[in-house]
A protein has these predicted regions:
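A short helix-loop-beta submotif of the ANL/AMP-binding
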Residues: 130, 134-140
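Short helix-capping segments at alpha-helix termini
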Residues: 84-88, 194-199, 224-229, 256
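Conserved core segment of the aminotransferase class I/II
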Residues: 225-280
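Conserved PLP-anchoring active-site segment centered on the Schiff-base-forming lysine
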Residues: 110-132
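Active-site phosphate-binding strand-loop segment of PLP-dependent enzymes
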Residues: 140, 144-214
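Short acidic capping loops at alpha-helix termini that bridge into adjacent secondary structure
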Residues: 88-94, 114-117, 164, 228-231
């Protein structure tokens, strides 16, 4: 008799994690490996970040924090969002978790009911479908071919949406393609979403600073501020500051969604690492 829950039959180990483990094994065996498996920056965590983490340990900031992160970090996140996007958030609209992946998983857990659909443009980060399935949702994969620069078009989005659609996950800059949406493209997607007022949008912006073009990438809410009450913005420090192992991410969005995420944080990790929060 299997001791695993039946839901475990619907998911597989992350292909990128499996490939990363193999690359690590080969490297430890002396092979020279160019590792393109996971989103790991090729530079080290900045020294000032390391020093802030060490200082937190030395002054004893090693205890539980609030489930949604420290007030100081939430304030810093509000400041960054204001500075970068021009969007103003309140403290109640911010939550900090143990990595952007954890925040996304918790957001889906808090909002999906059995059979709810989540639209995922492809190519996609390999963890999205499994996170949806583990939370009893149904991934709806929408192919976005090279002819469309690997981006979701308004026409393809309209075709994918149904009365069961709960979320659209929009990852830009995209993992794995690096695709970035223009303001006009985002506005076109917003027009489609206007006809489906019950659909929520999760914008995964973890790569927003890993951008080689001119200027910077545009966030959906900058192009479509009217979606403010439907969009959950997810970001973190892993990619921009090479802090993948520090496990710290955050979200910004409507109070009711953030409140639900906080409710789930309490019985799961309790709180993000206080050392990582101080470093961030």
């Amino acid at each position: 008799m299997s001791v695993e829950a039946t839901r475990m039959t619907r998911v597989q180990p992350s292909p990128s994690t499996v490939a990363a483990a193999k690359a690590r094994e080969l490297r430890e065996g002396g092979a020279r490996i160019l590792d393109l498996t996971v989103g790991e920056p090729d530079f080290d965590t900045p020294d000032n970040v390391k020093r802030a983490g060490i200082a937190a340990i030395e002054r004893g900031d090693t205890k539980y924090t609030a489930v949604n992160g420290t007030a100081a970090l939430r304030s810093a996140i509000i400041g960054r969002l204001r500075r970068v996007t021009g969007i103003e958030y309140t403290d109640a609209e911010i939550s900090v978790g143990s990595g952007a992946k954890h925040v996304i998983f918790t957001a889906l857990m808090a909002t999906l009911s059995p059979g709810d659909e989540v639209v995922i443009p492809a190519p996609y980060w390999v963890s999205y479908p499994d996170m949806v399935v583990l939370n009893e949702g149904t991934p709806v994969i929408v192919a976005c071919p090279i002819e469309d620069d690997f981006k979701l078009t308004a026409a393809r989005l309209r075709e994918a949406l149904t009365e069961r659609t709960r979320w659209l996950i929009l990852n830009a800059p995209s993992n794995p393609t690096g695709a970035v949406y223009t303001r006009a493209e985002l506005a076109a997607l917003a027009e489609v979403l206007a006809d489906h007022p019950d659909v929520l949008v999760l914008t995964d912006e973890i790569y927003d600073e890993v951008f080689l073009g001119e200027g910077r990438c545009t966030s959906l809410l900058e192009a479509a501020p009217q979606l403010r009450e439907r969009v959950l913005v997810v970001n973190g420090v892993s990619k921009t500051y090479a802090m993948t192992g520090w496990r710290l991410g955050y979200c910004a969005g409507p109070k009711d969604r953030v409140r639900a995420i906080n409710k789930l944080q309490s019985p799961t990790p309790s709180c993000p690492s206080p050392i990582s929060q101080a470093a961030a």
